[in-house]
Amino acid sequence: MIIPGRLRALVVDDNAYARAISAASLKKLGVGDVVQADAGAAAILALMTEPFDVMLMDWYMPDVSGAGLMQVLRDPRFGAAQATPVILMTAYASRDNVVRARELGVNEVLVKPFTTDQLGIALGRILGQAAQAAADQSIFL
């Protein structure tokens, strides 16, 4: 699956290698702009200053966890970034973690290590949801 080059993605992981692999996979899928953040706090700052079409994030990070980041992101006071689709990347995909992530508004869950094809499928589902939501809203304009 090829993603249009104008998409912007934010990759958040405290592990530099995991960030680099995820960013490379997004580029391979055709994502035009990939920004990397090494911590949850850095991701919050990035989301406050520029729009992203999707965010990939780790669940366990030392400063602000994935759960904490989702609580901030999905808060209505956070503004337009609140609607940013999120793919959780985790090596700890226990039932409790996945349920909690979904409750907090995570759109897709990928278990590390994942393939570029698996990431492409998750992106396709997210982009399909976004397109459907936009179509649904246009009916009421």
Q: Each PLM stretch: what is its role?
A:
Residues M61:
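Receiver (REC) domain active-site loop signature in two-component systems and cognate sites
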Residues A39, S65-L73:
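Acidic catalytic/metal-coordinating carboxylates
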Residues Q36-V54:
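Acidic, metal-coordinating helix/loop segments flanking the phosphotransfer/catalytic sites
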